[in-house]
Curated annotation (Swiss-Prot):
Zn(2+) binds at residues 567, 571, 669, 673. This is Alanine--tRNA ligase. Keywords: Aminoacyl-tRNA synthetase, ATP-binding, Cytoplasm, Ligase, Metal-binding, Nucleotide-binding, Protein biosynthesis, RNA-binding, tRNA-binding, Zinc. Consists of three domains; the N-terminal catalytic domain, the editing domain and the C-terminal C-Ala domain. The editing domain removes incorrectly charged amino acids, while the C-Ala domain, along with tRNA(Ala), serves as a bridge to cooperatively bring together the editing and aminoacylation centers thus stimulating deacylation of misacylated tRNAs. It catalyses: tRNA(Ala) + L-alanine + ATP = L-alanyl-tRNA(Ala) + AMP + diphosphate. Gene3D superfamilies: 2.40.30.130, 3.10.310.40, 3.30.54.20, 6.10.250.550, Bira Bifunctional Protein, Domain 2, Threonyl-trna Synthetase, Chain A, domain 2. Its EC number is 6.1.1.7. Catalyzes the attachment of alanine to tRNA(Ala) in a two-step reaction: alanine is first activated by ATP to form Ala-AMP and then transferred to the acceptor end of tRNA(Ala). Also edits incorrectly charged Ser-tRNA(Ala) and Gly-tRNA(Ala) via its editing domain. One of its GO terms (molecular function) is ATP binding. CDD domains: AlaRS_core. It comes from Streptococcus pyogenes serotype M4 (strain MGAS10750). Belongs to the class-II aminoacyl-tRNA synthetase family. One of its GO terms (cellular component) is cytosol.
Length: 872
């Protein structure tokens, strides 16, 4: 077996499959493009779903890739096991309706065992297979595999929901008796239990059925096109071929671990407690790649995942004695390890480091807050005479503040308290159940549509015309091809068409189809790409249509021009964002409609009003500069040399279309555009908002809509000016400010009067002091305007020694407000109000010294006041 670096393994994999006629699919962005079913790209096949479900036919049905992936369904185990990772690389080879079982197995065996390639010892390889899949068993035998090395496993059948499914056969490497002292590894393998001796290195999925949850597996229909989908983890292959005990001792992780050793002053021991080293090395890889691909730490979705990874890594850094920010210092090492195939980490190093460091600094403040929260919890336990920290409180520290359970346990035990482990596990399970219920399953690829996939007739979109005559090539009605149709809805393909099919954020054209008499025979309501790329017109049929007949196709020209204004403006906006807020502001989605444009982009904070003003100004300057717009068709490399901005994560063919707006913007784009930027007329941003962690959205309008937006703003300003009696529009702001200042002064004066009135009233309220169980208390109903006045009473009460406990009740409108304040450790205000509030049909809570509640039954106020003596 050859001893290869991870980069050599990756390259040899790709070279082998290229020698078998496969095209190399570049690794896609970790943030899925146009796939809401996935949080992350989590496998090599995840970016190829469109090929497997038949919605798109690839140029080459044989594909290979090395795909960076992230899985975060079991973060707690990362660092505890030898092979568990969040970010990993999946090597794959795929056949879309081309070769199948025989070639997949034979070529896979050749790659692994041939001296020209990996050169694995044949006697070290074991294969599992689905018991009913005799063809795979026989093919392995034909390759020279001993029957004793073939293990049947009932679970070797791949299916997730409806869509492509089939048996799979897995390849394992035997690492020898040193990893199996009890000699039970083969039994564990047969029972489908992971073990350290027999390591799975490759899985070959034989996708031959259309899974249908409504029928038993034996009744699944054969796919019209059988597919091969395989995955081999680079980290596992590297561990085996480099003789490493775990994945972490390979060249993919050890350089990071060495840097952590320098930062911590600790030494990594492969046989000792090394969990913290592993966690940090794994998590900084995931963070570096994900942030480089446009995901940013946040409080939801993939942003929450990144924040959780970073905080977990920071806490493990503290366990190693690293108390300052340090993770950002590891980004360079990650980039250097992966540079040969993934240069983007080093290219975006400054930005990634900035985000990681800022998040570390924020978390440092959060840790301080968490420590304060834990101190409060322990103080409360002491006051209540309890000796155990509850599981729900441990979970809150873990989930909200990022405190590992071990740290909470250590601090609590140092203070003399026990830990409710079972309660914590229960709270953790509840959260995991909620998370699983919320996750959209991403494996199902949908049913293949044989009718659409079978359209092979050529069809060409004509960019430079709004109307043309063309022959009708294909009619599909009720999912069947037909020669003619006279009513209902149908799908049509023409030899050529002026109708743009929805793509790249630009909506489809609409329009009409006319016969040779000039009569409208169909209305085009939508145009989408067929699996083989033809524009597929969805039409409402008004009169007879037949294959082979020529028709005149007319798009709605006015609508197209409105869409083009927004699309061209989108390119200008993208360039302006780069200039104003930074090149990290890359496109995360767009929509170019008739009435508006919507542009989503990666950015870590709200765009300020001043920045929005600069962006808007810059776009309009380019409109007024009347820049010529040109389009060029060329190859991707030439386009990049021209400075074309490619959208990361998008797949481009051999020939790409470059849209250039003067010297201001150059992008790869297949959409339609104006001839000159001046045709946009006017550009106005109407909204900027966050739509998710690390993603912002701008909605803007152009032309007539932009003019209307400005006029609406002017009308609103005129109305305000008239209301505040400003002599001119430019004076309105000063008038409003003057009114605001006057209102603030009046409010301040009013508040002072209220305080004086409350102080005067307090004298009467605080006279009635009662006593129960050795505690002095005041319980009174007061007449106040709002709940804030109750707090003012409490503030006055705290200034003097009126009593130990204060209970105030006020009927404000239809609601009842209750306040409990305590100066003694013997009475917990929060607990007391929980007992009192239900009397007035309310609930509430608070801290030991102050608590408030709201209720709805004012008729029970007297009963509540009477109950205070028993509750104290």
């Amino acid at each position: 077996m050859k001893e290869l670096s991870s980069a050599q393994i990756r390259q040899m994999w790709l070279d082998f499959w290229k020698s078998k006629g496969h095209c190399v699919e570049p690794s896609a962005n970790l943030v899925p493009v146009n796939d809401p079913t996935l949080l992350w790209i989590n496998s090599g096949v995840a970016t190829l779903k469109k090929y497997f479900d038949g919605s798109v036919i690839p140029e080459n049905p044989r594909i290979t890739n090395a795909q960076k992936s992230i899985r975060t369904n079991d973060i707690e185990n990362v660092g505890k096991t030898a092979r568990h990772h969040t970010m990993f690389e999946m090597l794959g080879n795929f056949s879309i309706g081309d070769y199948f079982r025989d070639e997949a197995i034979e070529w896979g065996f050749e790659l692994l065992t041939s001296p020209d390639w990996f050169d694995f010892p044949k006697d070290k390889l074991y294969m599992t297979y689905y018991p009913d899949d005799k063809d795979s068993y026989n093919r392995w035998i034909a390759c020279g595999v001993e029957p004793s090395h073939l293990v049947p496993i009932e679970d070797n059948f791949w299916e997730i929901g409806a869509g492509p499914s089939g048996p799979d056969t897995e390849i394992f490497f035997d690492r020898g008796e040193d990893f199996d002292p009890e000699n039970i590894g083969l039994r564990l393998l047969a029972e489908d239990i992971e073990n350290d001796r027999y390591i799975e290195i490759w899985n070959i999925v034989l996708s031959q059925f259309n899974a249908d949850p409504a029928v038993p597996r034996s009744e699944y229909k054969e796919l019209p096109n059988k597919n091969i989908d395989t995955g081999a983890g680079l980290e596992r292959l590297a561990a085996v071929m480099q003789g490493a005990k775990t994945n972490f001792e390979t060249d993919l992780f050890m350089p990071i671990i060495r840097e952590v050793e320098k930062l911590s002053g600790k030494t990594y021991n492969p046989d000792g407690d090394n969990m913290s080293f592993k966690v940090i090395a794994d998590h900084i890889r995931a963070l570096s790649f994900a942030i480089g691909d446009g995901a940013l730490p946040g409080n939801e979705g993939r942003g929450y995942v990144l924040r959780r990874l970073l905080r977990r890594a920071v806490m493990h850094g503290r366990r190693l004695g690293i108390n300052e920010t340090f993770l950002y210092k590891l980004v360079l090492t990650v980039g250097q390890i992966m540079e040969s195939y993934y240069p983007e980490v080093l290219e975006k190093r400054d930005f990634i480091e900035k985000i990681v460091k800022r998040e570390e600094e924020t978390f440092a403040r959060t840790i301080d807050a968490g420590s304060g929260h834990l101190d409060s919890l322990l103080a409360q336990l002491k006051a209540e005479g309890k000796d155990t920290l509850e599981g729900k409180d441990i979970f809150k520290l873990y989930d909200t503040y990022g405190f590992p359970v071990e740290l909470t346990e250590e601090l609590a035990e140092d203070a003399g308290y026990k830990i409710d482990h079972e309660g914590f596990k229960s709270a953790m399970k509840e959260q995991q159940d909620r998370a699983r219920a919320a996750v959209v399953k991403g494996g199902s690829m949908g049913m293949q549509n044989e009718t659409l996939a079978g359209i092979v007739e050529e069809s060409r979109f004509e960019y430079d015309t709004y109307s043309l005559e063309s022959s009708l090539s294909v009619i599909i009605a009720d999912n069947e091809r037909t020669e003619a149709v006279s009513e209902g809805q149908a799908l049509l393909v023409f030899a050529q068409t002026p109708f743009y099919a929805e793509m790249g954020g630009q909506v489809a054209d609409t329009g009409r189809i006319k016969n040779d008499k000039g009569d409208t025979v169909a209305e085009v309501v939508d145009v989408q790409k067929a699996p083989n790329g033809q524009p597929l017109h969805t039409v409402n049929v008004l009169a007879s249509l037949s294959v082979g007949t020529n028709y005149t196709l007319e798009i709605n020209k006015e609508r197209r021009l409105a869409v083009e204004k927004n699309h061209t403006a989108t390119h200008l906006l993208h360039a302006a964002l780069h200039n104003v807020i930074g090149e990290h502001a890359t496109q995360a989605g767009s929509l170019n409609e008739e009435e508006f444009l919507r542009f989503d982009f990666t950015h870590f904070e709200a765009v300020s009003n001043e920045e929005l003003r600069h962006i808007e100004q810059e776009v309009n300057e380019q409109i007024w500069n009347a820049l010529t717009i040109t389009t060029t068709e060329t190859d991707v490399e030439t386009a990049k040399e021209m400075g074309a901005m490619a959208l990361f994560g998008e797949k481009y063919g051999k020939v790409v279309r470059v849209v250039q707006i003067g010297n201001y913007s150059v992008e790869l784009c297949g959409g339609t555009h104006l001839n000159n930027s001046s045709e946009i007329g006017l550009f106005k941003i109407v909204k900027e908002e966050g739509i998710g962690s690390g993603t912002r959205r701008i909605i803007a309008v152009t032309g007539r809509q932009a003019f209307e937006a400005y006029r609406n703003q002017e009308d609103a300003l005129k109305e305000i000016a008239a209301t505040v009696k400003a002599p001119q529009l430019k004076d309105a702001a000063a008038k409003v400010q003057a009114l605001s200042d006057s209102l603030r002064d009046l409010q301040k004066e009013n508040a002072e009067l209220k305080e004086k009135a409350a102080a005067a009233a307090a004298g009467d309220v605080f006279k009635d002091v009662q006593e129960a169980k050795g505690v002095r208390f005041i319980a009174s109903q007061v007449d106040v305007a709002d709940a804030g006045a109750l707090r003012t009473f409490a503030d006055n009460w705290k200034q003097k020694d009126y009593s130990d406990v204060l209970v105030l009740v006020a009927a404000i409108g239809e609601k009842v407000n209750v306040l409990v304040a305590s100066k003694t450790k013997d009475v917990h205000a929060g607990n007391m109000i929980k007992e009192l509030a239900p009397i007035v049909a309310g609930r509430g809570g608070g801290k030991p010294d102050m608590a408030m509640a709201g209720g709805s039954d004012a008729s029970k106020i007297a009963e509540l006041l009477a109950a205070v003596a028993e509750t104290v």
